[in-house]
Amino acid sequence: MSGSSRRGERLRVAVVFGGRSNEHAISCVSAGSILRNLDPRRFEVIAIGITPQGSWVLTDGNPDALAITDRRLPEVSSQSGTELALPADPRWGGQLVSLPPGAGEVLASVDVVFPVLHGPYGEDGTIQGLLELAGVPYVGAGVLASAAGMDKEFTKKLWSAAGLPIGPHAVLRPSRQSLDREELQRLGLPAYVKPARGGSSIGVSRVSSFDELPAAIAAARRHDPKVIVEAAINGRELECGVLEFPDGRLEASTLGEIRVAGVRGREDGFYDFETKYLDDAAELDVPAKVEDDVADAVRQLAIRAFEAIDCQGLARVDFFLTDDGPVINELNTMPGFTTISMYPRMWVASGVDYPTLLATMVETALSRGIGLR
């Protein structure tokens, strides 16, 4: 069912959050911020949490329950509401049905889904595929771009094929335990060891000697059997938001900069999970203090990076600004939407307030529809 068939009524937006990934808590926090900022005059919001075990739960949508409180991370549980399912059958028209007891009862019907899921089993094309099967429009990238954007190896392959600047890296698939001599020489030290399909800096280690690599690889593999090792790049950390509008045009936001080195004991400059979400230790400059020509070049690169993976809807593109120019580091197809997250802050600094930003994403999803495009 589309919003246009219910003229004069509010659009029903299902905000889906939580999920099975190790970024479950950050997804909850992002959803809380979105629930506070979706315009209630335009949207009827349905809040659906996914437990760490994968159960879908219809919740009351209370944003306060989705906040980090005294360093305690929020979590969806089966007691958070009524368990439900979205049938992968377009004939159901976006209806959400209860699971036993009362199996099959229609609990709600939605016009569009806002999948605020970070990491595997959500941001990686899986829920996007379900929504395509179910015939329900959704905010953000499609199946291919979501999968490619989640996997750092394939993101970099697509960027390299498009002639975009990326840093040295090597990939360890599950059958490989260590880097070879050529890779070690090419990457040098220090280096960063990361789960290939993760985010929020979870499982990431900075190594300053090759002796530290085995432990760092093991730490990353607790989150993903595939690991990527990246050369450390000496440069300022810049970010840029890309937003698609209902008419298909793309715009890049004002830039933001993350500064961690020397902040509250973080002389290594490593923007890890605790620095991001628990300690509030990073300094964020929005807009970033860069020359206009540099900002323009980074914004153009952000849109090229977005297009190179066939992205849709939105993305945050992360850069290092080196003496030789910008280098693209990562792209997030569903960036954080917490109160400290750079993506909404950069758009606010660009003159797009938070409710308008969210409304644009929903309108773009409805304009795009589903299926091949």
From Swiss-Prot:
Chief localization: cytoplasm
Gene3D superfamilies: 3.40.50.20, ATP-grasp fold, A domain (3.30.1490.20), ATP-grasp fold, B domain (3.30.470.20)
Keywords associated with the record: ATP-binding, Cell shape, Cell wall biogenesis/degradation, Cytoplasm, Ligase, Magnesium, Manganese, Metal-binding, Nucleotide-binding, Peptidoglycan synthesis
Binding site for ATP: 184-239
Signal sequence interval, chain numbering: none
Chain ranges passing through the membrane: none
Binding site for Mg(2+) 1: 318, 330
Domain of life the protein comes from: Bacteria
SUPFAM superfamilies: Glutathione synthetase ATP-binding domain-like, PreATP-grasp domain
Residues of the ATP-grasp domain: 156-363
The protein's annotated pathway: Cell wall biogenesis; peptidoglycan biosynthesis
PROSITE patterns the UniProt entry points to: ATP_GRASP, DALA_DALA_LIGASE_1, DALA_DALA_LIGASE_2
Enzyme class: ligase
Function comment: Cell wall formation.
Protein name (database record): D-alanine--D-alanine ligase
Organism: Mycobacterium ulcerans (strain Agy99)
Gene name linked to the record: ddl
